[in-house]
Amino acid sequence: MNKIGAMRKNLTPDDLDGLLARPLVAVLATYRDNGDVLLSPVWHRWRDGGFDVVTRGDDVKVRHLREDPRASIVVFEHEPPYRGIEVGGRVELGRADADVVRDIAVRYLGGEEGGAYADQGHDDTLIRLEPGRLRAWDFADDL
């Protein structure tokens, strides 16, 4: 069997807890007015079966999502075993409270720098994406 054909399938987010716990930069896809896709690197956290992304309220991603709430996000490893997850669905937008901003900033920048970033008091929007569809992969058995 070729390497691609042996990929483990039917994975769930629970199978990928280690991956989702890592501070990997995700890619968020939103739709422009003309239907083109905008791909944006984002910080995220996986919580309660969905992704939280925080961005400034006036960001282009938020403008897109107000017009069209469909989005996808992908998180993946750049080294073996090349695990990843893609989630698509409709987002909910809300105000990001200080605790969410701090949690995500500390996740990516560490305690001191993340705290300093969060203390700047941004006007942030919380983008919440729960799976409408999910695709996950893991090439561990192939390597």
Describe every region a protein language model picked out:
Residues 19-20, 65, 104, 129:
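A generic structural signal for nonpolar/aromatic side chains embedded in well-ordered alpha-helices
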Residues 17-18, 43, 63, 117-119:
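Short secondary-structure boundary/capping segments
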Residues 12-15, 39-40, 58-60, 113-115:
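A generic local structural motif
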Residues 1-11, 80-143:
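Charged, gly/pro-rich active-site loop segments
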Residues 2-27:
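Short, basic/aromatic recognition patches
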Residues 23-57, 63-65, 71-75, 85-86:
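Short beta-strand segments
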Residues 66-67, 142:
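Short amphipathic alpha-helical segments
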